[in-house]
Amino acid sequence: MTEQPDCLGAAEERTWDAAVLAFRLLDQRVEQDLQGEVDLPLTYYELLVMLSKDPHGALRMSELAERTHTKPSRISHAVRKLAEGGWVERRHCENDRRSWFAALTDQGWRLLRDAGARHVRSMREYVFDVLTPEQQGQLLDISRTLLDRLDPEHAGGHASRAGAREHTPQEASA
């Protein structure tokens, strides 16, 4: 007797297809908005946001890679591009010369302010203006449930992870 391959049911397939398409289109639209208005890729914007959440606007490169679930080589490339634009600078870690920090510059803070304003308008237009408060709560609950399954090491802590620090204030401001 041959076993049938596992298949999604019709309702599961509709749910999956709708979720994947919605988030792909959302990603594309936000990317287009940021590129069109401030000439900044969404990925770079997300890195600037990560840096801005640190009290000193600086994180170890390894921390950026971990928080974004991105390979260190991709983070290095992105930070190099951001540094070429004058938005980020790379600094050596005082107590570990093999480690590097990425730190927002004044110009980077200005870019983040402008890009952040565009990002907020996009999020409102594509997400929050079309969802009721109840749906927004459901989306949050669903997202947290999925994140806890996909990233069990940080289960329950996804909202607070951005504030975690790996360094001392002296290292970041050096």
Placement of each model-derived feature along the sequence:
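N-terminal helix-turn-helix DNA-binding core of bacterial DNA-binding proteins
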Residues: Q28-K71, H158
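Short, locally clustered residues in the helix-turn-helix/winged-helix DNA-binding domain
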Residues: R24, V49-D54, G116, R144
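Charged, amphipathic alpha-helical coiled-coil/dimerization segments
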Residues: T2-Q4, R80-Q138
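Short, hydrophobic-biased segments on the C-terminal half of alpha helices
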Residues: M61, V79-R80
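N-terminal positioning helix adjacent to the helix-turn-helix/winged-helix DNA-binding module
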Residues: A11, T15, T43-Y45, Q107, ...
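N-terminal leader segment of winged-helix/HTH proteins
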Residues: M1-V38, G85, H167-A174
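C-terminal regulatory/oligomerization modules of transcriptional regulators
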Residues: M1-A10, P133-A174
